[in-house]
Amino acid sequence: SDLLEKNLSEILTKITWKKSMKWANYDLYWGRPLKSILAIFNKKPLNFVFNHINSSNKTFIDKSLEEGLKIFNNFNSYIKFFKQKGILIDQDLRKKIIQNKINEIINKKNLKIEQNDRLIDEIVNIVEKPAVIICDFDKKFLNVPSEILITTMQSHQKYLPTFDKKNNLTNNFFVVSDIKDTKGFVKLGNERVIEARLSDAEFFWEKNKTQNL
């Protein structure tokens, strides 16, 4: 623990972000505003200073879960607390849940998805309590080249397109949400979003076809 306390501050300074921010009167640039640093090792708090923050066994809890500071005495209690709130700390577990649900649906619908580990990993890291939803878009958009549709879904929206057994793109796609879609609102909202995106893609594709090379 002494070694960790001595080196953690320096290690944190070496973390870089594509985009950083500065807030209040602090000198620290970070991906998001830091309010606390929770650091525990062998059931004991680690004590070090990073910029303007002292580490401790306390952390702020999102107000949607529980107001104020929360004390954790070990990592297991940390995992247990968030699991009770429906949040899965273990990213490997989140990934497994997402993949299992997708496999369950594609087997039922006789579909398949393209293996895209980078996109899956990105999705895993932007959800806390993953809910997999299968959506669809108007089949008329399948007249647009599949490369354009796939790029629109994957790059812009972080959706997972589906294919039939002959590797043809279908009008079904997967959304991984942080909200259970009990009333179908998440599905409807994402279908509206992709409708707008694909309408734009279709417009520019048709426009480009009129241009001579």
Show the residue positions of the predicted features.
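Long, basic N-terminal domains or extensions that often function
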Residues: 1-158, 163-167
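Function-dense linear segments that define catalytic or interfacial modules
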Residues: 161-213
